[in-house]
């Protein structure tokens, strides 16, 4: 069938197999063109491996360092009449490229929060990899089932403490408008921490340590976004921010429990980008459209793959990586520095319905959004019939 994007609200409900494969190939090509990346990981577990920063981490590990990779993700398979999710096609493309390079790659599809999927991952690592020397935690989910109690927790995107009114951009209706968000109650904050905090990251590391699958000196990192004043009320100082603070707690706990193995655990703060997660957050489409404009003009714009390649070479596997006062690895400085933020703030204050497309790089935002689902990718013929079926072997 010929596949065109079906957009509903902030998500695209279908995906393009060839477009996803082309996007993965572009990222692999970028990493392969970077030359020798130096010493790095050899056996990598990526939890949340199929899109965005998690997929980029898997690509850098495999094609930058020649590492064996095990991915864990939760994707919907295709049928003859319905496309799979983008992450399914990304993973199929990754497997094909890895196989051609003679690299070990396996992927487990299921709920990473569950005990069953952790057990499957442990069996696979024992059988195929021995031990892992890098664990990437890059999950984004709106809900989590507690593996002990079966209780379902749901995350909310709300400010903490007081109501918040600000500008936002409705991608569906192409309009700038004010949005008012009521503050979260204690239960909503607690549930968001359960879903998006560090508990599950810690449980993964506990399970791997118990099975003696963490190599001496193994590194692990969970990804976060910290941002600055413009996004703090909905991000840093909001329910998501509270959950992300819990990652700092988890990092310290992981290090403390695994001292004899010299395990290093970091929270890594990355720049704001169009991802399936960020497009769902109020304010972010407007903010990202503006930072794309400013950072492209400054020559500092980067996508997922450039950010992760930099994280690995300049921070995670550097001799003595620079840490912030909370002990985090920071890759967001080109966005969060005062000069860049001042330019974004000036645009933010000026932007209206009438001048939005002129002041922002919404065209760039929309292109990246479509690309998440395999659409608007350079060199792909979108009039060509597509086979929706794609496998991971």
Swiss-Prot record:
PANTHER family: ENOYL-[ACYL-CARRIER-PROTEIN] REDUCTASE [NADH]. Gene3D superfamilies: NAD(P)-binding Rossmann-like Domain. The record marks 75 as: Plays an important role in discriminating NADH against NADPH. One of its GO terms (molecular function) is trans-2-enoyl-CoA reductase (NADH) activity. This is Enoyl-[acyl-carrier-protein] reductase [NADH]. Pathway: Lipid metabolism; fatty acid biosynthesis. Substrate binds at residue 225. Monomer. Its EC number is 1.3.1.9. Belongs to the TER reductase family. The keyword Lipid metabolism applies. Pfam families: Eno-Rase_FAD_bd, Eno-Rase_NADH_b, Enoyl_reductase. NAD(+) binds at residues 48-53, 74-75, 111-112, 139-140, 244, 273-275.
